[in-house]
Structures are given as structure tokens and as C-alpha cells.
Amino acid sequence: FNSAIGPYKGGLRFHPTVNQSILKFLGFEQVFKNSLTGLPIGGGKGGSNFDPKGKSDREVMAFCQSFMTELCKYIGADTDVPAGDIGVGGREIGYLFGQYKRVRDLYEGVLTGKGLTYGGSLIRTEATGYGVVYILNELMKDHNDSLDGKTVVVTGSGNVAIYAVQKATQLGAKVVAMCDSNGYIHDPNGINLDVVKDIKEVKRGRIKEYADRVEGATYTEGVGIW
């Protein structure tokens, strides 16, 4: 969208709602987000209305490879550096980066969010979720307060939400609810993050499974968490 102060930088989104209008606004928004970091990076956004949900690993890999075969003509370490977003996690980034190397025969900083074994950054997975909570905690300090002892609700159950829950818990809060696009769970005893990770990261399931596995937890279908 804008590269006035550096190469384009922003996430790739794979979700059925993706269209040109959404990506244009997200790219516009990314310009300001990146500018506020003080780093020499511009803003951009990309993606597809491909939905990884319900697809096999082979199907996701095939799409990522086809997508990168075209995208690789327009990106590079000093031109445009995509990252992950909704629907594009470590698995998808790995497939995309593998195809980039295969087509361009280059091993450079062309995608962020890669695994540690092929050039990724330590704690990249946790960074966004942790950042949300650190900023919230700093805001509360301005009001002579902190997260310690607070009851917290977190929207989502993907990568950002999982690590926001983890950091909030480490800072003394009790997270009692999370959600996905189908509904939300409530656990008055505090969310068991190991169970959530197993459901979302290992089995790639839906958050409603949490209520079947944790005593005292409930699931509400078709209602927003707020």
C-alpha cells in the first residue's frame, strides 16, 4: 500500500471474507501501525478467499505453493516482506517459504513468522499476544492498577489469543472465557491453556470441544463473547 519509508510489510490472510476492499483498508491501517514502531518499513496486506479450515495438509500445501508461484514475482527482502495473519500460521508460512526458495533459489528474509530451523525469530509466535497484554498492563499502570487479580475475557482462540491468555495468566489475571467464530467457552476456574492448545494447535478443532473435556466449563453456540 505504501513504501515511503521502507519495504512493504504486512500479513497474508486466507479467509472466505477476503476481498479487495478489505485488503485495501487493512493495508492502509498497516502503514500507520508500522510507522509507529519507528522502524523503516512501509505497510501492505495480501491474501485470498481460500479457507484452510476443513482442508487437508496436502490441499493447504498445494494452494500455498500455487499462491507463492505468483506472489514471488512481486516480493523480496527489500521490496515486500509478507507475514502471517488470519488463516496463515506457521504451517502456511513454511509452505510459502519452501516454494519461494524452490522458485527463486533464494534463502533470504522474505517472510516473517518462519520456524526457527529455517531462519525464524525466537518468540515470534508469542510476540503479538504478549504485546497486547504488555500494552494493557502499561495502560493500567497509568491508573495505578495492574492485571494482578483481575478477571479477563479474551476474544478469539488462535495464535494471538492463546499467548495473550498465557501472558495475562503469568501476570496474575484469571482468564475465564475465549471464543471462535461459532461461539464461546466459559470456565469459572480459569482457562486451561494446555487443553486449548491441544484443541487448536494439535487437532485443529473448534473451541466447543473444551467444554467436553474440562469439568465446570460451558459452551454457548452462536453468540458473541461480548
What are these language model-derived features?
Residues 26, 70, 95-99, 198-202, ...:
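Residues that form generic nucleotide/phosphate-binding pockets
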Residues 112-115, 120-225:
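Glycine-rich phosphate/diphosphate-binding loop of Rossmann-like nucleotide-binding domains
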